[in-house]
């Protein structure tokens, strides 16, 4: 039994032609080559017809739909870009106008403040010049009073010095004229 199994296996495992040569692969047999070409042609024609009638129109429709979607998206993107460019230009124009208004307001405020400061400075100068004139008058009157006191003190001192040195009382007119001459020169 074991032998018959081995023989059976060997007989079915190898297909040999007469004389011990192997048979060629069936698609390469010369006898069936023409019928295989006809079968292939029929299969490719059928495949082409099915593809061209069913699959290719669907693919073409999908490609056309995608192309239209892309064109629509590009057109919408261009429109949005144009709108954003217009909005940007309007924003820049508004910004420039706002800057110009701010500059004008700043200049106007600066001029008002400068005018107010100038008016206040002039008023202060006038008040100071009045105070200065009053101070000069006060100084002059104080100087005159001090000088008159100095003249009296100098006369008294000169009289006391001469009296101390000489022992005699000098003439008050001579002392006054000597003090006046000394104060002038």
From Swiss-Prot:
Pfam families: ATP-synt_B
CDD domains: ATP-synt_Fo_b (cd06503)
GO-annotated cellular components: plasma membrane; proton-transporting ATP synthase complex
Membrane topology (UniProt): Single-pass membrane protein
Keyword Calcium: no
Transmembrane segments: 34-56
Chain spans, region Disordered: 1-25
Domain of life: Bacteria
Example GO molecular function: proton-transporting ATPase activity, rotational mechanism
Keywords, sorted A to Z: ATP synthesis, Cell inner membrane, Cell membrane, CF(0), Hydrogen ion transport, Ion transport, Membrane, Transmembrane, Transmembrane helix, Transport
Major site of localization recorded for this protein: membrane
Function statement: F(1)F(0) ATP synthase produces ATP from ADP in the presence of a proton or sodium gradient. F-type ATPases consist of two structural domains, F(1) containing the extramembraneous catalytic core and F(0) containing the membrane proton channel, linked together by a central stalk and a peripheral stalk. During catalysis, ATP synthesis in the catalytic domain of F(1) is coupled via a rotary mechanism of the central stalk subunits to proton translocation. Component of the F(0) channel, it forms part of the peripheral stalk, linking F(1) to F(0). The b'-subunit is a diverged and duplicated form of b found in plants and photosynthetic bacteria.
Subunit comment: F-type ATPases have 2 components, F(1) - the catalytic core - and F(0) - the membrane proton channel. F(1) has five subunits: alpha(3), beta(3), gamma(1), delta(1), epsilon(1). F(0) has three main subunits: a(1), b(2) and c(10-14). The alpha and beta chains form an alternating ring which encloses part of the gamma chain. F(1) is attached to F(0) by a central stalk formed by the gamma and epsilon chains, while a peripheral stalk is formed by the delta and b chains.
Protein family (similarity comment): Belongs to the ATPase B chain family.
Protein name (Swiss-Prot/TrEMBL): ATP synthase subunit b 2
Species this chain originates from: Nitrobacter winogradskyi (strain ATCC 25391 / DSM 10237 / CIP 104748 / NCIMB 11846 / Nb-255)
Gene that encodes it: atpF2
